[in-house]
């Protein structure tokens, strides 16, 4: 990371000189129309060049943002659609490097999330923000929003941010970890179905090498006393059951999760289970974890590959 990279990041988040000098009634009018959810007035304003030139300008109290961010924050779908129709930048950043999609996800506005994704919003959010829409949805248990993000290409595994120092390497904090710790089993399962790595929620060996002592999902789930369903899912999706080191104190406890892990260590995987792992792993490596439905095999086998049997 050099000074030029840092300067570029801060320049992206600073308002233009024109924005600073012209906190005009035009910008206030646009924001007021969005705040009032008055899509008709907003549309009429944006048909005039004196207003449209400020469609991507950041303004407002608190966290200055664009009108599109404001619409996403309040869940004002009709205003959001009007702004997009008039050419608003779908991935515009506020001063915290958050995109309108990130804001919509944070506030739980599923309809706005769908429209933004269909308009081409990056499902991963901004590379300059250490959080992401997927992390937020997994933490909040917003399974429908998480489904939309993953269906539009969001990454289920942890990836290094740009620049490198923007990545949190002090601890494991991928979406699988958050879903487990916050008790969102549906999100946990959904992430695994979309190719999340069941060991570290990360396939980037370079990134893992920078973590002093990476902890596996199995370790985290046992440490936080997660329900046995989490342990079973990790085992079923191919987690390395020998990675967690279990002390004698733990193995002597009457814990269902530990019992499942010990049972898995003592019982070889069935051939059918191993085939499922190989097929799913091959699809993930090809970047098409959801292509199972396209396989020319009996429906019952498709259901098995999707962990529905």
UniProtKB/Swiss-Prot annotation:
UniProt KW keywords: ANK repeat, Repeat, Ubl conjugation pathway
Gene3D superfamilies named in the record: Ankyrin repeat-containing domain
Every SOCS box domain range: 268-308
One GO CC annotation: ubiquitin ligase complex
Known partners and oligomeric status: Interacts with CUL5 and RNF7.
Pathway the protein takes part in: Protein modification; protein ubiquitination
Record's keyword annotation contains Transferase: no
Function: Probable substrate-recognition component of a SCF-like ECS (Elongin-Cullin-SOCS-box protein) E3 ubiquitin-protein ligase complex which mediates the ubiquitination and subsequent proteasomal degradation of target proteins.
Description of its domains: The SOCS box domain mediates the interaction with the Elongin BC complex, an adapter module in different E3 ubiquitin-protein ligase complexes.
Record's signal peptide: none
Protein name according to UniProt: Ankyrin repeat and SOCS box protein 12
Family recorded in the similarity comment: Belongs to the ankyrin SOCS box (ASB) family.
Pfam family, one: SOCS_box
GO BP annotations listed: protein ubiquitination
InterPro entries: Ankyrin-SOCS_box_domain, Ankyrin_rpt, Ankyrin_rpt-contain_sf, SOCS_box
């Amino acid at each position: 990371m050099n000074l030029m990279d840092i300067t570029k990041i801060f320049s992206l988040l600073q308002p233009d000189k024109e924005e600073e000098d012209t906190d005009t009634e035009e910008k206030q009018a646009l924001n007021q129309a969005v705040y009032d959810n008055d899509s008709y007035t907003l549309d009429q304003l944006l048909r005039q060049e004196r207003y449209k030139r400020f469609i991507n300008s950041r303004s407002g109290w608190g966290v200055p943002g664009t009108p599109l961010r404001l619409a996403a924050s309040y869940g004002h779908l009709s205003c959001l659609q009007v702004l997009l129709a008039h050419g608003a930048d779908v991935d515009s950043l506020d001063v915290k490097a958050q995109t309108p999609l990130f804001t919509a996800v944070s506030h739980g506005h599923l309809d706005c999330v769908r429209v933004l994704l269909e308009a081409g919003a990056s499902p991963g959010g901004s590379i300059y923000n250490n959080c992401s829409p997927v992390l937020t949805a997994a933490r909040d248990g917003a399974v429908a929003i998480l489904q939309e993000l993953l269906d539009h290409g969001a990454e289920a595994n942890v990836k290094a941010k740009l620049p490198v120092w923007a990545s949190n390497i002090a601890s494991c904090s991928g979406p699988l970890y958050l879903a487990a710790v916050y008790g969102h089993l549906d999100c946990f399962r959904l992430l695994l179905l979309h190719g999340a790595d069941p060991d570290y929620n990360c396939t980037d060996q370079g990134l893992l090498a920078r973590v002093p002592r990476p902890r596996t999902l199995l370790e985290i789930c046992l440490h936080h006393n997660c329900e046995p369903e989490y342990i079973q899912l990790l085992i079923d999706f191919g987690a390395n059951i020998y990675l967690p080191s279990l002390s004698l104190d733990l193995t002597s406890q009457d814990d269902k999760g530990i019992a499942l892990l010990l049972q898995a260590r003592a019982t070889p995987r069935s051939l059918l289970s191993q085939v499922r792992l190989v097929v799913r792993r091959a699809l993930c490596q090809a970047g098409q974890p959801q292509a199972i439905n396209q396989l020319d095999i009996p429906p019952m086998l498709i259901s098995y590959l999707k962990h529905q049997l």
